[in-house]
UniProtKB/Swiss-Prot annotation:
Positions in coiled-coil regions: none
Protein's job: Catalyzes the transfer of the diacylglyceryl group from phosphatidylglycerol to the sulfhydryl group of the N-terminal cysteine of a prolipoprotein, the first step in the formation of mature lipoproteins.
The keyword Transmembrane helix is annotated on this UniProt entry: yes
Record membrane topology: Multi-pass membrane protein
Keyword Cell cycle: no
Subcellular location: Cell inner membrane
Name used for this protein in its record: Phosphatidylglycerol--prolipoprotein diacylglyceryl transferase
Family: Belongs to the Lgt family.
One of the GO BP terms on file: lipoprotein biosynthetic process
Pathway: Protein modification; lipoprotein biosynthesis (diacylglyceryl transfer)
GN (gene name): lgt
A GO-annotated cellular component: plasma membrane
């Protein structure tokens, strides 16, 4: 059994002002995505400036935060937030939905593309390899917050979490960090080293994320207010991942078929 590192969720306190690690992880994710995007920007569009890139990252970040929070409210805990609406603004306590964040990003990208003459999938393909940076940082934030831990286990790397009872559990946040953060980043980085059909990068992203998340849900404790939805093992996260996997496969098939049907330059 490993020892859980006792990390204060508050990274810095200045009088009444408290800066939480969870919020800092989002800033790290957004900053890391911007740095990587600035390296890839000229390959994407030589006419782009740092100002336009910053504009895109800003709106995508808004989509992540607003969509992620509203998605959690709608998908996971609607009754509690209806009863206590002010809880919606307490984001430092956790409670973000990746699937809601993805919908928020899609809306932001569609709007940005309309303004700047880029297609939806051109922008999504550019953004997709950047997302694992934020996903990985967010999972570290979950770990520090001692939330979203896994089921009771006797594996050698199990941990006793401060608010998870006396028994050791799977550190499922670290599994998600390794898969959604590190592995997904490497897969997309290698895949985009050479030109790919439009929408194929987006398709690979949602396919891999859906698979990784579906698998980890088997060892992660479901949200207490929902529990298992069916068969004693199906979680809301898995339900939301099924359409992602199907959409990812469909996007990749469509992208490559569309590319093959286009006339090639002599």
């Amino acid at each position: 059994m490993l020892t859980y590192p006792q990390i204060d969720p508050v990274a810095l306190a200045i009088g009444p002002l408290k800066i939480h690690w969870y919020g800092l992880m989002y800033l790290i994710g957004i900053g890391g995505a911007w740095l990587l995007a600035s390296r890839r920007m000229k390959r994407f569009d030589p006419s782009w400036t740092k100002e336009r890139l910053s504009d895109l990252v800003f709106w995508v970040a808004c989509g992540v935060i607003l969509g992620g929070r509203l998605g959690y409210v709608l998908f996971y805990n609607l009754d509690e937030y209806i009863a206590n609406p002010t809880l919606i603004f307490e984001v430092w306590k956790g409670g973000m939905s990746f699937h809601g964040g993805l919908l928020g990003v899609m809306l932001a990208v569609w709007w940005f593309g309309k303004r700047h003459g880029k297609s939806f999938f051109q922008l999504m393909d550019f953004i997709a390899p950047l997302v694992p940076i934020g996903l990985g940082a967010g999972r570290i934030g979950n770990f520090i917050n001692s939330e979203l831990w896994g089921k009771v286990s006797d594996v050698p790397w199990a941990m006793v979490f401060p608010n998870g009872g006396p028994l050791p559990r799977h550190p499922s946040q670290l599994y998600q960090f390794a898969l959604e953060g590190v592995a997904l980043f490497v897969i997309l980085w290698l895949f985009t080293r050479k030109p790919r059909p439009t929408a194929s990068v987006s398709g690979l992203f949602v396919l891999c994320y859906g698979i990784f998340r579906f698998v980890v849900e088997f060892v992660r404790v479901p949200d207490a207010q929902l529990g298992y939805l069916a068969w004693g093992w199906l979680t809301m996260g898995q339900v939301l991942c099924v359409p992602m996997v199907l959409a990812g496969i469909a996007l990749m098939v469509w992208a490559y078929r569309r590319d093959a049907a286009q006339p090639k330059a002599a």
